[in-house]
From Swiss-Prot:
Keyword hit for DNA damage: no
Gene name as annotated: rplV
Name this protein carries in UniProt: Large ribosomal subunit protein uL22
Keywords from the UniProt entry: Ribonucleoprotein, Ribosomal protein, RNA-binding, rRNA-binding
A Pfam family that the UniProt record links to this protein: Ribosomal_L22
Composition-biased stretches (Low complexity): 117-140
Subunit structure: Part of the 50S ribosomal subunit.
């Protein structure tokens, strides 16, 4: 397993996380190819981090998968913009850290497992209920008893 960390990217972490979720669990070569055609600014940085992580481990891009791609918030640059009547409003320019971990793809040996089949369920028979007897109201029943 190898890692790559790119720090202080001038990109909002929330925007970068949208792209980071897309590549988790993908083959590194496939992830870099799909990021190449994304129009987002963060796609370029994440693709760069993936290729750096692959190179750090000494792997080939087709033999590793992206185990995790994490985007953390970094320092926020604060600027001021002049506004009306001598006031100013604050502008926040967020930055982020991108951490990518790649691991060698595990080739799973297919094991044949015999699964016991369930016995087919018995057919359900529909039964119709006999109509319920009509009950007389309590006032009428007490009047009949008295007479």
């Amino acid at each position: 397993m190898s890692k790559a960390l790119i720090k202080f990217i001038r990109l909002s972490p929330t925007k970068a996380r949208l792209i980071a979720r897309e590549v988790q669990g993908m083959n590194a070569e496939l992830a870099m190819a799909s990021l190449k055609f994304m129009p987002n600014k963060g796609a370029k940085y994440i693709a760069n981090a993936i290729s750096s992580a692959v190179a750090n481990g000494g792997f080939e891009a087709n033999e590793v998968i992206v185990k995790s791609c994490r985007v953390d918030a970094a320092a926020v640059l604060k600027r001021f913009r002049p506004r009306a009547r001598g006031s100013a409003s604050r502008i926040r320019k967020p930055t982020s850290h991108i951490l990518v971990e790649v691991a060698k793809a595990e080739v799973k040996a297919e094991e044949k497992k015999t699964v016991a089949k369930k016995a087919p369920a018995a057919k359900k028979t529909t039964t119709t209920k006999a109509p319920a007897k009509k009950t007389t109201s309590t006032k009428k029943a007490t009047a009949k008893k008295e007479s």
